């Protein structure tokens, strides 16, 4: 059996994998052991009390994190005329229609979010096989297909994140960076949990927020007492 490294022993001494920590304490531990040479992301995994195999229990949506994500997102918008001008004024990085679609088909995808006005979906629909697998396909359920493209752009720039439950009933998300103070991370997680609660399927029975754990990109995971997450 291989010997534990000094860091692994320190983590093992300080973090009890069976304990539920108050959110502030959990985040403090995650930040303490996030020792990579870059500003690690602080991530969360939420186990929901749903049956992800049932179509009426798929949890999906978007939420603007009050303290941002620590990453500046580049936003592309499919719009024309007045809507295109509104998108540019709101801070969109790329705005177009057929020209933007041609760039995407050519492999030019220097953006993190794609937004479309409803009338542009005739063009965007042809890009499903390219945008879909990358999680970039606009969808009205998360506010990225909308006549109000300006608000959608501002939300994306302000730190909006999309969430969707996976096949195991878990929602994964990023709530900030190691450099964020604990209060900002707490506020972001509370906003995400509030959005998940609002998206609870009517057919979901029993305990909805079953397990919550926080971690960093290269670091340890710490379980959180759900009662300590104040929305």
Swiss-Prot record:
One of its GO terms (biological process) is regulation of translation. Disulfide bonds: none annotated. It comes from the Bacteria. GO terms for cellular component: cytosolic large ribosomal subunit. Transmembrane segments: none annotated. One of its GO terms (molecular function) is structural constituent of ribosome. Gene3D superfamilies: 3.30.190.20, 3.40.50.790. InterPro entries: Ribosom_uL1_bac-type, Ribosomal_uL1, Ribosomal_uL1-like, Ribosomal_uL1/biogenesis, Ribosomal_uL1_3-a/b-sand, Ribosomal_uL1_CS. Keywords: Repressor, Ribonucleoprotein, Ribosomal protein, RNA-binding, rRNA-binding, Translation regulation, tRNA-binding. Part of the 50S ribosomal subunit. Binds directly to 23S rRNA. The L1 stalk is quite mobile in the ribosome, and is involved in E site tRNA release. Belongs to the universal ribosomal protein uL1 family. PANTHER family: 54S RIBOSOMAL PROTEIN L1, MITOCHONDRIAL, LARGE RIBOSOMAL SUBUNIT PROTEIN UL1M. This is Large ribosomal subunit protein uL1. It comes from Polaromonas naphthalenivorans (strain CJ2).
